[in-house]
Amino acid sequence: TGYLCGEAFHGKSVYIISRRPLRDQFAGVIIALSPQKGGAEPKIIVAPEGDIFYEPQIRERLRSVRGLDISQLSCLYEKSCGAVIFYRSPDGNKVLLVKNHNGKYWSFPKGHVEKGESEKQTALREIKEETGLDVKIYDHYRQISDYCPFGKIKKRVIFFLAETKTDQVDIQQDEIDSFVWATFPQAEKMCSYENDLRVLHAARRYIDKKDAHNGSPDSI
């Protein structure tokens, strides 16, 4: 534990999470707030500047702290993993786009990392849960998408490239509103976010290069 310095929080006690020993004073950032029972002030969790901890890591490190309620932990950094999923249909390659209940735009299947999972394990689990698809994840394709909706929670999404052998999708109805298989040119028109377009373009280039190397006749 320690204390914050600064006009807004001067002298307020905090919980500190770090991967290395710290000096008596250091520059840190608030990474989470933990509301307490009985209307008490939320506890502040801080990490050294430049270090990022996500919810599973924060919970693991704080679970043994006596007297700290982390049942309603609110993390200011979130990490998700997913994939650009494509299918080699008879009339060309198609990419799967989904629209979530709380989203207005087309994007790719993804979800939060759970404790003990690798990035690829998270992506495979989320794909299976949201779409029912079994996929093969390609090596050497890993795209990072960072964004901060409403200027609050900083979100990072790791996207892989995955191929499925079927276009039969079984959507998770409590998560997904709708889905569509689109050609890459169609998907580029449907995706609204710059990050999603960048991820999509990188996937298309990767498949083009791999197919050219393998002599595949597929065209996207």
Please annotate each region the language model reported.
Residues 8-10, 20-23, 90-91, 102-105, ...:
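Short, charged/polar surface micro-motifs in flexible loops or helix N-caps
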Residues 66-77, 189-220:
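Charged phosphate-binding loop/patch that engages nucleotide di/tri-phosphates or the phosphate backbone
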Residues 85, 97, 159-163:
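Short, well-ordered beta-strand micro-motif
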Residues 2-76:
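Hydrophobic N-terminal alpha-helices or hydrophobic patches in metabolic proteins across all domains
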